[in-house]
Amino acid sequence: MAITVNTNVSALIAQRHLGSASEMLNQSLERLASGKRINSAKDDAAGLQISNRLESQMRGLDVAVRNANDGISIMQTAEGAMQETTSLLQRMRDLSLQSANGANSKADRQALQEEMGALNDELNRIAETTSFGGRKLLNGSFGQSSFQIGASSGEAVQVSLKNMRSDSLDMGGFSYVAAGMADSQWRVTQDNRQLTMSYTDAKGKQHNIQIQAKVGDDIEELATYINGQTDKVSASVNDKGQLQLFMAGKETSGTIDFKGSLANQLQMNVTGYEAVDTLDITEVGGAQRAVAVIDTAMQYVDSHRSELGALQNRFNHAINNLDNVHENLASSNSRIKDTDYAKETTQMVKQQILQQVSTSILAQAKKQPNLALALLR
């Protein structure tokens, strides 16, 4: 091996290894201090891209969970108010049944009507004041809203809140009253027992309800028989002996067309659309119709509560899934970006030893030019 003075190759080699060991040691110290394996793109360019995409997805999942929880809170608020609406309707139904009792005087029915009015006002107050974050929920203004419950576009669920005011069209239906008045002697005869009710539903489909009344039934028995044959209409009799029929507004897009021999005898006429806010129980006939109207309103409210309950369960399951996906993404991101302390401390000790060795060797290499002086003596 040549002995030179101008170029100390051994020292240069030792210096290079010392620099490499120092660089690797600094990298290990940075990873241990930050807790991250990737601190800049030079550490792992591909891994950094993947990690950033995973973190973006996880942030989106966090927002989606908050959105779903907001949706649940809105539905819980609305459903709680509708529970009280159901209680009010139950009480109004009780008052209607009580007013239909023949033992009540006109003054008694007027007192019951006053309570009906107060309950109706409270029902509307609940519908108008129930809100979430300043947004009205049950007065018909909420309509339909989209809740983003996913980390990407297009992962939204539509939630609609219906109008719970007592004057809502869904809170009532069409009432019909027979022009003919049946006295105590009136009976269904063999020649007058056919009653066909034709109507078109909200989807445009034609329906026919065919009733073949029992010969010998009086008007009250006829109403009971009709109620037993179909659940689409509700039949009752007023204090004048007139048959009354009621069909919920959601069942039909128009009025009922009556046909048949019994229909011709009774001469059923539509009296108009009747909702909860127009109920009058000061007469037996009105009290009887009120029961049918309130039953329709209760079915409407309960049906919407069921829809909201199903959506709440859906949102809860969505949150569970989002949490599970977030957990798996976090685990994957950790494997890519986070520091493995067991591995990195081993690497640090290794580089520290190499640094010390390289420093020692560099010191020895620097002494080699002194050999030239020994040759010159």
From Swiss-Prot:
It is found in: Secreted; Bacterial flagellum. Keywords: Bacterial flagellum, Coiled coil, Secreted, Virulence. It comes from the Bacteria. Its main location: secreted. Gene3D superfamilies: 3.30.70.2120, f41 fragment of flagellin, N-terminal domain, Flagellar export chaperone, C-terminal domain. One of its GO terms (cellular component) is bacterial-type flagellum. One of its GO terms (molecular function) is structural molecule activity. Residues 97-130, 300-337 form a coiled coil. InterPro entries: Flagellin (IPR001492), Flagellin_C (IPR046358), Flagellin_C_sub2 (IPR042187), Flagellin_hook_IN_motif (IPR010810), Flagellin_N (IPR001029). The keyword Protein transport does not apply. The keyword Secreted applies. Belongs to the bacterial flagellin family. Flagellin is the subunit protein which polymerizes to form the filaments of bacterial flagella. FlaE is not essential for flagellar synthesis and motility. May have a role in virulence unrelated to motility. Heteromer of multiple flagellin subunits including FlaA, FlaB, FlaC, FlaD and possibly FlaE. This is Probable flagellin E. It comes from Vibrio anguillarum (Listonella anguillarum). The gene is flaE.
